[in-house]
Amino acid sequence: KILTALIAAECCNPDDVVTIPKSCVGVEGSSVYLEEGEKLTVKELLYGLMLRSGNDCAEALACHISGSVAQFAERMNQRAVELGAEHSHFTNPHGLPDDDHYTTARDLAKIAAFALGNPLFKEVVSTRRAEISWASHEYNRVLINKNKMLSELEGATGIKTGYTKKAGRCLVTSCERNAMELVC
């Protein structure tokens, strides 16, 4: 999801409007419950992706950017190589298990460290709470960042938590110390 967010932040205007296709509704795992035909901005989808870990948001961004999940995965792999991620291969934008989808802590740290240089990415991953529209409801979706480090570790600046049965609990985090931003 870190690389997905980086690519979206690099190539999209945050105010671009994305119409949610049927293929991005009901995606397995964590979700913001996107609805077919719903319109959200790229920035709203980034908040859904990085705060709520919305797999549906990941696929919506992938389809918006590349036309399909498979084509977006190709773009992810190309970008990962450009960033020096030598031991990674991506098959989807959300990180759900697939035998051909893998990475390492070192590669994720390289990607995350670079991504923090993108102002939109940094803004999104450092946000503790956001509201995004929900057209079919009288209220907005309220998203609380799952990264508890933001409130429990002085100087924490964000990034991403994760969980799958196969990988277990995962965390890539960043923190400012002595005028340096550390990623681990």
List the predicted regions and their residue ranges.
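Active-site-adjacent loops and short helices of periplasmic peptidoglycan-processing enzymes
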Residues: 2-119
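Short small-residue beta-strand/loop micro-motif enriched in glycine and branched aliphatics
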Residues: 58-59, 182-184
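Penicillin-recognizing serine hydrolase domain
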Residues: 68-183
